[in-house]
Amino acid sequence: MIVSWSLKDAVVVVVGSGKNAYRRVNLCLSENSSKIFWFCRSSADGGFDVGHLQLDAKKSDAIEILPISEFDPVRSLTTLGKEETDFLVDAVFVSESNHHEKEILHRTCKRYRIPLNIIDNPSLCSFTLPATWSEPPLQISLSTSSNGCRLAQRLLRHVVSSLPSGMPEAIERFGRVRAITKTPEKKQWINHVSDFWPLEKLVRMTEDDLLAIVSDNFSLPLSSSQSSSLANSYESLSTTLDKPSLTLDPEAFPTHKRGSIALIGSGPGSPDLLTVAARKAIMKADYVLADKLVPEAVLQLIPRHTPLFIARKFPGNADKAQDELHQVAFDALSRGDYVVRLKQGDPYIYGRGGEEYLFFTQHGYVPTVIPGISSALMAPISAGIPVTHRGVADQFLVCTGTGQKGSMPKIPSFVPTQTTVFLMALHRLEILVQALIESGWPRVLPVCIAERVSCPDQRFIFSTLEDVVEEYNKYESLPPGLLITGYSCNTLRNTA
Protein backbone atom coordinates (compact mmCIF):
# COMPACT_ATOMS: atom_id res chain seq x y z
CA MET A 1 0.00 0.00 0.00
CA ILE A 2 1.44 3.36 -1.04
CA VAL A 3 0.61 6.29 1.24
CA SER A 4 1.74 9.90 1.33
CA TRP A 5 3.45 10.56 4.65
CA SER A 6 4.58 13.95 5.93
CA LEU A 7 7.86 14.38 7.82
CA LYS A 8 7.28 18.08 8.38
CA ASP A 9 8.50 19.14 11.86
CA ALA A 10 9.52 15.52 12.55
CA VAL A 11 12.60 14.39 14.49
CA VAL A 12 14.40 11.80 12.37
CA VAL A 13 17.39 9.52 12.97
CA VAL A 14 19.60 8.53 10.02
CA VAL A 15 22.26 5.84 10.53
CA GLY A 16 25.02 5.30 7.96
CA SER A 17 27.24 7.04 5.43
CA GLY A 18 27.61 7.51 1.71
CA LYS A 19 25.11 8.42 -0.98
CA ASN A 20 22.24 6.33 0.40
CA ALA A 21 22.43 8.08 3.77
CA TYR A 22 22.82 11.45 2.07
CA ARG A 23 19.69 10.85 0.00
CA ARG A 24 17.67 10.09 3.11
CA VAL A 25 18.98 13.17 4.89
CA ASN A 26 18.20 15.26 1.83
CA LEU A 27 14.71 13.73 1.70
CA CYS A 28 14.08 14.77 5.30
CA LEU A 29 15.35 18.27 4.58
CA SER A 30 13.04 18.58 1.58
CA GLU A 31 10.15 17.52 3.83
CA ASN A 32 11.06 20.24 6.36
CA SER A 33 11.89 17.91 9.23
CA SER A 34 12.67 19.97 12.32
CA LYS A 35 15.69 17.91 13.43
CA ILE A 36 17.82 15.24 11.78
CA PHE A 37 20.29 13.28 13.89
CA TRP A 38 22.77 11.79 11.45
CA PHE A 39 24.98 9.09 12.92
CA CYS A 40 27.79 9.00 10.38
CA ARG A 41 31.09 7.21 9.85
CA SER A 42 34.39 9.05 9.67
CA SER A 43 35.96 9.97 6.35
CA ALA A 44 39.61 9.52 5.38
CA ASP A 45 40.48 13.07 6.43
CA GLY A 46 39.08 12.55 9.93
CA GLY A 47 35.78 14.34 9.33
CA PHE A 48 32.38 12.84 8.56
CA ASP A 49 31.50 10.99 5.36
CA VAL A 50 28.54 13.17 4.42
CA GLY A 51 28.94 13.18 0.65
CA HIS A 52 27.45 16.17 -1.19
CA LEU A 53 25.98 17.47 2.04
CA GLN A 54 29.30 19.17 2.65
CA LEU A 55 28.44 21.55 -0.18
CA ASP A 56 25.02 22.66 0.93
CA ALA A 57 22.99 21.50 3.89
CA LYS A 58 25.78 20.90 6.42
CA LYS A 59 25.27 24.37 7.82
CA SER A 60 21.60 23.78 8.36
CA ASP A 61 20.51 24.02 11.97
CA ALA A 62 18.17 21.11 11.31
CA ILE A 63 21.08 18.65 11.05
CA GLU A 64 23.24 17.37 13.87
CA ILE A 65 26.02 15.05 12.71
CA LEU A 66 27.28 12.55 15.28
CA PRO A 67 29.84 9.71 15.22
CA ILE A 68 28.18 6.41 14.40
CA SER A 69 29.88 4.95 17.47
CA GLU A 70 27.56 7.06 19.65
CA PHE A 71 24.42 5.49 18.20
CA ASP A 72 22.50 3.28 20.61
CA PRO A 73 19.52 1.38 19.16
CA VAL A 74 17.45 1.99 22.29
CA ARG A 75 18.69 5.17 23.96
CA SER A 76 19.02 7.20 20.74
CA LEU A 77 15.47 6.38 19.68
CA THR A 78 13.87 7.07 23.06
CA THR A 79 15.67 10.25 24.16
CA LEU A 80 16.24 12.42 21.08
CA GLY A 81 12.60 13.12 20.27
CA LYS A 82 10.34 15.96 21.33
CA GLU A 83 8.72 16.23 24.71
CA GLU A 84 5.28 16.04 23.10
CA THR A 85 6.11 12.52 21.82
CA ASP A 86 7.65 11.42 25.14
CA PHE A 87 11.07 11.96 23.56
CA LEU A 88 10.52 9.20 20.98
CA VAL A 89 11.84 10.03 17.53
CA ASP A 90 9.38 10.11 14.61
CA ALA A 91 11.25 7.93 12.09
CA VAL A 92 14.48 5.98 11.60
CA PHE A 93 16.44 5.40 8.39
CA VAL A 94 19.36 2.94 8.26
CA SER A 95 21.41 3.10 5.06
CA GLU A 96 23.65 0.10 5.84
CA SER A 97 22.05 -3.25 5.06
CA ASN A 98 24.53 -5.17 7.24
CA HIS A 99 24.33 -2.95 10.31
CA HIS A 100 25.17 -5.19 13.26
CA GLU A 101 22.34 -3.87 15.45
CA LYS A 102 19.53 -3.98 12.92
CA GLU A 103 17.64 -6.75 14.76
CA ILE A 104 17.68 -4.75 18.01
CA LEU A 105 16.60 -1.69 16.04
CA HIS A 106 13.70 -3.61 14.57
CA ARG A 107 12.49 -4.81 17.97
CA THR A 108 12.85 -1.35 19.53
CA CYS A 109 10.96 0.39 16.73
CA LYS A 110 8.24 -2.24 16.80
CA ARG A 111 7.86 -1.85 20.56
CA TYR A 112 7.58 1.93 20.42
CA ARG A 113 5.79 2.01 17.04
CA ILE A 114 8.51 4.09 15.43
CA PRO A 115 8.53 3.85 11.61
CA LEU A 116 11.73 2.08 10.48
CA ASN A 117 13.41 1.70 7.10
CA ILE A 118 16.55 -0.43 6.69
CA ILE A 119 17.99 -0.55 3.20
CA ASP A 120 17.79 -3.97 1.50
CA ASN A 121 16.00 -5.49 4.51
CA PRO A 122 12.29 -5.35 3.67
CA SER A 123 11.38 -7.93 6.32
CA LEU A 124 12.69 -5.59 9.03
CA CYS A 125 11.04 -2.45 7.65
CA SER A 126 7.72 -1.00 8.72
CA PHE A 127 7.80 1.17 5.58
CA THR A 128 9.79 1.25 2.34
CA LEU A 129 10.69 4.09 0.01
CA PRO A 130 9.19 3.86 -3.48
CA ALA A 131 11.08 5.01 -6.52
CA THR A 132 10.17 8.69 -6.75
CA TRP A 133 10.40 11.41 -9.38
CA SER A 134 9.47 14.99 -8.62
CA GLU A 135 9.10 18.13 -10.70
CA PRO A 136 6.71 20.25 -8.63
CA PRO A 137 3.82 20.16 -8.47
CA LEU A 138 4.00 16.71 -10.09
CA GLN A 139 5.31 13.80 -8.04
CA ILE A 140 5.32 10.19 -9.21
CA SER A 141 6.04 7.19 -7.00
CA LEU A 142 6.37 3.58 -8.08
CA SER A 143 6.82 0.50 -5.93
CA THR A 144 7.57 -3.14 -6.64
CA SER A 145 6.54 -4.05 -3.07
CA SER A 146 10.15 -4.77 -2.10
CA ASN A 147 10.65 -7.16 -5.00
CA GLY A 148 13.28 -5.10 -6.79
CA CYS A 149 14.19 -1.49 -6.12
CA ARG A 150 16.42 -1.26 -9.21
CA LEU A 151 13.59 -2.51 -11.39
CA ALA A 152 11.31 0.07 -9.78
CA GLN A 153 13.75 2.83 -10.73
CA ARG A 154 13.88 1.54 -14.30
CA LEU A 155 10.11 1.38 -14.56
CA LEU A 156 9.84 4.88 -13.13
CA ARG A 157 12.22 6.21 -15.78
CA HIS A 158 10.04 4.56 -18.42
CA VAL A 159 6.91 6.19 -17.00
CA VAL A 160 8.49 9.64 -16.74
CA SER A 161 9.92 9.45 -20.26
CA SER A 162 6.43 8.81 -21.63
CA LEU A 163 5.07 12.07 -20.20
CA PRO A 164 4.59 14.94 -22.64
CA SER A 165 7.01 17.80 -22.14
CA GLY A 166 5.50 20.53 -19.99
CA MET A 167 3.25 18.32 -17.86
CA PRO A 168 4.16 19.93 -14.47
CA GLU A 169 3.42 23.41 -15.84
CA ALA A 170 0.12 22.15 -17.26
CA ILE A 171 -0.82 20.78 -13.84
CA GLU A 172 -0.11 24.18 -12.30
CA ARG A 173 -2.43 25.82 -14.81
CA PHE A 174 -5.16 23.29 -14.06
CA GLY A 175 -4.72 23.96 -10.34
CA ARG A 176 -5.10 27.72 -10.76
CA VAL A 177 -8.24 27.35 -12.87
CA ARG A 178 -9.75 24.83 -10.44
CA ALA A 179 -9.08 27.25 -7.58
CA ILE A 180 -11.08 30.05 -9.21
CA THR A 181 -13.86 27.78 -10.51
CA LYS A 182 -16.55 27.93 -7.86
CA THR A 183 -19.56 25.99 -9.13
CA PRO A 184 -19.56 22.17 -8.74
CA GLU A 185 -20.88 21.77 -12.29
CA LYS A 186 -17.97 23.69 -13.84
CA LYS A 187 -15.46 21.84 -11.67
CA GLN A 188 -16.92 18.63 -13.07
CA TRP A 189 -16.25 20.00 -16.56
CA ILE A 190 -12.60 20.48 -15.64
CA ASN A 191 -12.55 16.91 -14.29
CA HIS A 192 -13.87 15.59 -17.60
CA VAL A 193 -11.09 17.37 -19.47
CA SER A 194 -8.55 15.82 -17.08
CA ASP A 195 -10.07 12.36 -17.57
CA PHE A 196 -10.63 12.22 -21.31
CA TRP A 197 -8.66 14.79 -23.31
CA PRO A 198 -5.28 13.73 -24.77
CA LEU A 199 -2.29 14.66 -22.62
CA GLU A 200 -0.54 16.13 -25.66
CA LYS A 201 -3.43 18.56 -26.00
CA LEU A 202 -3.56 19.37 -22.29
CA VAL A 203 0.07 20.46 -22.12
CA ARG A 204 -0.49 22.87 -25.01
CA MET A 205 -3.52 24.51 -23.42
CA THR A 206 -3.02 27.98 -21.96
CA GLU A 207 -4.81 29.26 -18.89
CA ASP A 208 -7.16 31.15 -21.22
CA ASP A 209 -7.99 27.88 -22.98
CA LEU A 210 -8.89 26.29 -19.64
CA LEU A 211 -10.98 29.28 -18.63
CA ALA A 212 -12.80 28.99 -21.95
CA ILE A 213 -13.85 25.47 -21.01
CA VAL A 214 -15.83 26.72 -18.03
CA SER A 215 -17.20 29.73 -19.87
CA ASP A 216 -20.85 29.74 -20.92
CA ASN A 217 -20.40 31.82 -24.05
CA PHE A 218 -16.81 31.45 -25.16
CA SER A 219 -15.61 28.95 -27.74
CA LEU A 220 -12.24 27.32 -27.25
CA PRO A 221 -9.53 29.36 -28.99
CA LEU A 222 -8.14 26.97 -31.56
CA SER A 223 -5.73 27.52 -34.40
CA SER A 224 -7.17 26.91 -37.85
CA SER A 225 -5.48 25.26 -40.76
CA GLN A 226 -3.68 28.05 -42.59
CA SER A 227 -2.85 25.82 -45.49
CA SER A 228 -6.31 24.39 -46.08
CA SER A 229 -6.99 26.77 -48.96
CA LEU A 230 -3.98 25.27 -50.72
CA ALA A 231 -5.09 21.70 -50.15
CA ASN A 232 -5.44 19.31 -53.04
CA SER A 233 -8.76 19.36 -54.82
CA TYR A 234 -10.73 16.12 -54.83
CA GLU A 235 -13.83 15.12 -56.74
CA SER A 236 -17.02 15.23 -54.71
CA LEU A 237 -18.23 11.89 -53.40
CA SER A 238 -21.84 12.88 -53.83
CA THR A 239 -23.80 15.88 -54.97
CA THR A 240 -27.13 14.31 -54.19
CA LEU A 241 -28.77 15.78 -51.09
CA ASP A 242 -31.54 13.23 -50.70
CA LYS A 243 -29.46 10.17 -49.80
CA PRO A 244 -26.54 9.39 -47.49
CA SER A 245 -23.04 9.18 -48.88
CA LEU A 246 -21.58 5.84 -47.77
CA THR A 247 -18.60 5.39 -50.06
CA LEU A 248 -15.75 3.42 -48.49
CA ASP A 249 -13.09 3.96 -51.16
CA PRO A 250 -10.12 4.93 -48.93
CA GLU A 251 -8.81 7.37 -51.55
CA ALA A 252 -12.11 9.14 -52.11
CA PHE A 253 -12.32 11.77 -49.38
CA PRO A 254 -12.73 15.01 -51.26
CA THR A 255 -12.79 18.67 -50.39
CA HIS A 256 -14.07 21.37 -52.69
CA LYS A 257 -14.38 25.10 -52.32
CA ARG A 258 -17.40 24.81 -50.05
CA GLY A 259 -15.75 22.22 -47.86
CA SER A 260 -16.99 18.73 -47.01
CA ILE A 261 -17.56 16.70 -43.89
CA ALA A 262 -17.42 13.03 -42.88
CA LEU A 263 -19.06 11.38 -39.87
CA ILE A 264 -16.62 8.70 -38.78
CA GLY A 265 -16.91 5.99 -36.15
CA SER A 266 -13.66 5.59 -34.23
CA GLY A 267 -14.60 2.19 -32.83
CA PRO A 268 -14.39 1.11 -29.19
CA GLY A 269 -10.92 2.46 -28.42
CA SER A 270 -8.02 0.61 -29.99
CA PRO A 271 -6.52 2.21 -33.11
CA ASP A 272 -6.18 -1.32 -34.52
CA LEU A 273 -9.97 -1.54 -34.72
CA LEU A 274 -10.39 1.54 -36.92
CA THR A 275 -11.52 0.79 -40.44
CA VAL A 276 -9.07 1.48 -43.24
CA ALA A 277 -11.48 4.11 -44.54
CA ALA A 278 -11.54 5.87 -41.16
CA ARG A 279 -7.73 5.95 -40.94
CA LYS A 280 -7.43 7.40 -44.43
CA ALA A 281 -9.99 10.07 -43.66
CA ILE A 282 -8.23 11.07 -40.43
CA MET A 283 -4.91 11.41 -42.22
CA LYS A 284 -6.44 13.56 -44.98
CA ALA A 285 -8.51 15.81 -42.71
CA ASP A 286 -7.99 19.57 -42.59
CA TYR A 287 -9.89 19.80 -39.32
CA VAL A 288 -10.97 17.15 -36.78
CA LEU A 289 -13.92 17.52 -34.42
CA ALA A 290 -13.89 14.78 -31.78
CA ASP A 291 -16.07 13.59 -28.93
CA LYS A 292 -14.42 13.69 -25.51
CA LEU A 293 -14.59 9.88 -25.17
CA VAL A 294 -12.52 9.17 -28.27
CA PRO A 295 -9.43 7.55 -26.71
CA GLU A 296 -6.07 9.27 -26.80
CA ALA A 297 -4.53 6.42 -28.79
CA VAL A 298 -6.92 7.18 -31.66
CA LEU A 299 -6.43 10.94 -31.43
CA GLN A 300 -2.67 10.43 -31.64
CA LEU A 301 -3.18 9.27 -35.23
CA ILE A 302 -4.19 12.81 -36.17
CA PRO A 303 -1.25 14.62 -37.82
CA ARG A 304 0.21 17.27 -35.52
CA HIS A 305 -0.46 20.03 -38.05
CA THR A 306 -4.19 19.21 -38.16
CA PRO A 307 -6.31 21.30 -35.76
CA LEU A 308 -8.29 19.24 -33.24
CA PHE A 309 -11.44 20.44 -31.51
CA ILE A 310 -12.87 18.33 -28.67
CA ALA A 311 -16.55 18.83 -27.94
CA ARG A 312 -17.31 20.27 -24.50
CA LYS A 313 -20.05 17.72 -23.82
CA PHE A 314 -19.87 17.90 -20.07
CA PRO A 315 -22.82 17.18 -17.74
CA GLY A 316 -25.49 19.83 -18.24
CA ASN A 317 -23.78 21.30 -21.29
CA ALA A 318 -24.53 18.77 -24.05
CA ASP A 319 -26.89 20.93 -26.12
CA LYS A 320 -24.70 24.05 -25.94
CA ALA A 321 -21.67 21.95 -26.78
CA GLN A 322 -23.43 20.53 -29.84
CA ASP A 323 -24.28 24.05 -31.04
CA GLU A 324 -20.68 25.11 -30.49
CA LEU A 325 -19.44 22.10 -32.43
CA HIS A 326 -21.74 22.96 -35.33
CA GLN A 327 -20.36 26.50 -35.41
CA VAL A 328 -16.75 25.31 -35.43
CA ALA A 329 -17.62 22.88 -38.23
CA PHE A 330 -19.26 25.62 -40.31
CA ASP A 331 -16.27 27.91 -39.85
CA ALA A 332 -13.98 25.18 -41.19
CA LEU A 333 -16.36 24.22 -44.00
CA SER A 334 -16.62 27.84 -45.12
CA ARG A 335 -12.84 27.85 -45.60
CA GLY A 336 -13.12 24.84 -47.88
CA ASP A 337 -11.74 22.42 -45.30
CA TYR A 338 -12.32 18.69 -45.28
CA VAL A 339 -13.80 18.21 -41.80
CA VAL A 340 -13.75 14.89 -39.99
CA ARG A 341 -16.37 14.48 -37.26
CA LEU A 342 -14.82 11.73 -35.15
CA LYS A 343 -17.30 9.87 -32.97
CA GLN A 344 -16.86 7.09 -30.42
CA GLY A 345 -18.03 3.66 -31.55
CA ASP A 346 -20.43 3.87 -34.48
CA PRO A 347 -22.02 7.22 -35.44
CA TYR A 348 -25.51 5.75 -35.78
CA ILE A 349 -25.63 3.75 -32.53
CA TYR A 350 -26.48 6.27 -29.80
CA GLY A 351 -23.98 8.68 -31.32
CA ARG A 352 -26.37 11.39 -32.58
CA GLY A 353 -24.99 10.58 -36.01
CA GLY A 354 -28.41 10.70 -37.61
CA GLU A 355 -29.12 14.12 -36.09
CA GLU A 356 -25.80 15.48 -37.32
CA TYR A 357 -26.35 14.01 -40.77
CA LEU A 358 -29.73 15.75 -41.04
CA PHE A 359 -28.36 19.02 -39.64
CA PHE A 360 -25.44 19.31 -42.05
CA THR A 361 -27.52 18.10 -44.99
CA GLN A 362 -30.16 20.76 -44.30
CA HIS A 363 -27.38 23.35 -44.39
CA GLY A 364 -26.02 22.19 -47.72
CA TYR A 365 -23.30 19.74 -46.69
CA VAL A 366 -24.01 16.04 -47.24
CA PRO A 367 -21.77 14.06 -44.87
CA THR A 368 -19.90 10.95 -45.83
CA VAL A 369 -20.70 8.32 -43.20
CA ILE A 370 -18.04 5.77 -42.26
CA PRO A 371 -19.19 3.15 -39.74
CA GLY A 372 -17.22 2.07 -36.72
CA ILE A 373 -17.23 -1.02 -34.52
CA SER A 374 -19.71 -0.33 -31.73
CA SER A 375 -18.75 -1.17 -28.16
CA ALA A 376 -22.13 -2.92 -27.98
CA LEU A 377 -20.63 -5.54 -30.31
CA MET A 378 -17.00 -5.41 -29.22
CA ALA A 379 -17.52 -5.53 -25.44
CA PRO A 380 -19.21 -8.95 -25.35
CA ILE A 381 -16.52 -10.40 -27.61
CA SER A 382 -13.72 -9.02 -25.44
CA ALA A 383 -15.44 -10.31 -22.30
CA GLY A 384 -15.92 -13.79 -23.76
CA ILE A 385 -19.69 -13.46 -24.10
CA PRO A 386 -21.38 -14.82 -27.25
CA VAL A 387 -24.45 -12.59 -27.62
CA THR A 388 -26.17 -15.45 -29.44
CA HIS A 389 -25.56 -19.09 -28.57
CA ARG A 390 -27.59 -22.15 -29.47
CA GLY A 391 -29.87 -23.13 -26.60
CA VAL A 392 -29.01 -20.00 -24.59
CA ALA A 393 -29.63 -16.79 -26.53
CA ASP A 394 -31.27 -16.24 -29.92
CA GLN A 395 -31.88 -12.48 -29.64
CA PHE A 396 -29.64 -9.45 -29.18
CA LEU A 397 -30.90 -6.05 -28.02
CA VAL A 398 -29.03 -2.75 -27.63
CA CYS A 399 -30.57 -0.14 -25.30
CA THR A 400 -29.61 3.10 -23.63
CA GLY A 401 -29.47 3.56 -19.89
CA THR A 402 -30.10 7.29 -20.21
CA GLY A 403 -33.05 8.77 -22.06
CA GLN A 404 -33.44 12.23 -23.56
CA LYS A 405 -32.44 15.02 -21.18
CA GLY A 406 -31.32 12.45 -18.62
CA SER A 407 -34.67 10.72 -18.24
CA MET A 408 -35.13 7.03 -17.49
CA PRO A 409 -35.67 5.13 -20.77
CA LYS A 410 -38.47 2.65 -21.29
CA ILE A 411 -37.43 -0.65 -19.74
CA PRO A 412 -37.75 -3.55 -22.22
CA SER A 413 -39.57 -6.70 -21.22
CA PHE A 414 -37.36 -9.51 -20.00
CA VAL A 415 -36.79 -12.28 -22.55
CA PRO A 416 -34.89 -15.30 -21.18
CA THR A 417 -33.21 -16.03 -24.53
CA GLN A 418 -32.10 -12.46 -25.12
CA THR A 419 -28.74 -10.76 -24.52
CA THR A 420 -29.27 -7.08 -23.75
CA VAL A 421 -26.57 -4.41 -23.75
CA PHE A 422 -27.19 -1.07 -22.03
CA LEU A 423 -25.01 1.80 -23.20
CA MET A 424 -24.57 5.02 -21.17
CA ALA A 425 -25.76 3.21 -18.05
CA LEU A 426 -22.95 2.98 -15.51
CA HIS A 427 -23.26 6.52 -14.13
CA ARG A 428 -26.81 5.64 -13.05
CA LEU A 429 -26.35 1.91 -12.54
CA GLU A 430 -28.23 1.69 -9.25
CA ILE A 431 -31.32 3.40 -10.67
CA LEU A 432 -31.28 1.25 -13.79
CA VAL A 433 -30.85 -2.02 -11.88
CA GLN A 434 -33.71 -1.13 -9.55
CA ALA A 435 -35.93 -0.35 -12.55
CA LEU A 436 -35.05 -3.68 -14.18
CA ILE A 437 -35.84 -5.65 -11.03
CA GLU A 438 -39.11 -3.78 -10.56
CA SER A 439 -39.97 -4.65 -14.17
CA GLY A 440 -39.63 -8.36 -13.44
CA TRP A 441 -36.05 -9.05 -14.49
CA PRO A 442 -34.57 -11.94 -12.44
CA ARG A 443 -32.37 -10.85 -9.56
CA VAL A 444 -29.95 -13.71 -10.26
CA LEU A 445 -29.61 -12.87 -13.96
CA PRO A 446 -25.90 -12.98 -14.96
CA VAL A 447 -24.50 -9.58 -15.93
CA CYS A 448 -21.15 -8.10 -16.90
CA ILE A 449 -19.82 -4.55 -16.71
CA ALA A 450 -17.32 -3.80 -19.49
CA GLU A 451 -15.13 -0.69 -19.33
CA ARG A 452 -12.60 0.81 -21.78
CA VAL A 453 -13.05 -2.10 -24.14
CA SER A 454 -10.05 -2.83 -26.42
CA CYS A 455 -7.85 -0.36 -24.51
CA PRO A 456 -4.83 -1.63 -22.53
CA ASP A 457 -6.65 -1.04 -19.23
CA GLN A 458 -9.94 -2.69 -20.22
CA ARG A 459 -11.85 -4.25 -17.32
CA PHE A 460 -14.73 -6.71 -16.94
CA ILE A 461 -16.77 -7.23 -13.77
CA PHE A 462 -19.04 -10.29 -13.73
CA SER A 463 -21.88 -10.48 -11.22
CA THR A 464 -25.64 -10.89 -10.96
CA LEU A 465 -28.27 -8.23 -11.42
CA GLU A 466 -28.98 -7.92 -7.70
CA ASP A 467 -25.29 -7.74 -6.70
CA VAL A 468 -23.73 -5.78 -9.55
CA VAL A 469 -24.11 -2.34 -7.94
CA GLU A 470 -22.33 -3.41 -4.77
CA GLU A 471 -19.61 -5.15 -6.80
CA TYR A 472 -19.10 -2.16 -9.10
CA ASN A 473 -18.80 0.26 -6.18
CA LYS A 474 -15.68 -1.58 -5.02
CA TYR A 475 -13.75 -0.07 -7.93
CA GLU A 476 -12.95 3.33 -9.37
CA SER A 477 -14.92 3.84 -12.56
CA LEU A 478 -13.09 3.60 -15.92
CA PRO A 479 -15.37 5.28 -18.46
CA PRO A 480 -16.59 4.65 -21.02
CA GLY A 481 -18.40 1.49 -20.03
CA LEU A 482 -21.59 -0.49 -20.51
CA LEU A 483 -23.74 -3.21 -18.95
CA ILE A 484 -24.27 -6.63 -20.56
CA THR A 485 -27.16 -8.76 -19.27
CA GLY A 486 -28.37 -12.26 -20.05
CA TYR A 487 -27.63 -15.93 -19.49
CA SER A 488 -25.07 -15.78 -22.29
CA CYS A 489 -22.76 -13.96 -19.84
CA ASN A 490 -21.93 -17.30 -18.24
CA THR A 491 -21.98 -19.53 -21.31
CA LEU A 492 -18.24 -19.70 -21.89
CA ARG A 493 -17.28 -19.08 -18.26
CA ASN A 494 -19.07 -22.27 -17.20
CA THR A 495 -16.93 -24.33 -19.59
CA ALA A 496 -13.60 -22.74 -18.68
UniProtKB/Swiss-Prot annotation:
Database matches in Gene3D superfamilies: Cobalt-precorrin-4 Transmethylase, Domain 1, Methyltransferase, Cobalt-precorrin-4 Transmethylase, Domain 2, NAD(P)-binding Rossmann-like Domain
Catalytic activity line of the entry: uroporphyrinogen III + 2 S-adenosyl-L-methionine = precorrin-2 + 2 S-adenosyl-L-homocysteine + H(+)
Keyword entries, A-Z: Amino-acid biosynthesis, Methionine biosynthesis, Methyltransferase, Porphyrin biosynthesis, S-adenosyl-L-methionine, Transferase
Gene Ontology biological process: methionine biosynthetic process; methylation; siroheme biosynthetic process; sulfate assimilation
Family matches, as InterPro entries: 4pyrrol_Mease, 4pyrrol_Methylase_sf, 4pyrrole_Mease_sub1, 4pyrrole_Mease_sub2, CobA/CysG_C, Met1_fungi, Siro_Cobalamin_biosynth, Uropor_MeTrfase_CS
One MF term in the entry's GO annotations: uroporphyrin-III C-methyltransferase activity
Entry EC no(s): 2.1.1.107
SUPFAM superfamilies named among the record's database cross-references: Siroheme synthase middle domains-like, Tetrapyrrole methylase
Tagged with keyword Transferase: yes
Family: Belongs to the precorrin methyltransferase family.
Reported function: Siroheme synthase involved in methionine biosynthesis.
UniProt name for this protein: Probable uroporphyrinogen-III C-methyltransferase
Organism: Schizosaccharomyces pombe (strain 972 / ATCC 24843) (Fission yeast)
Lineage of source species: Eukaryota, Fungi, Dikarya, Ascomycota, Taphrinomycotina
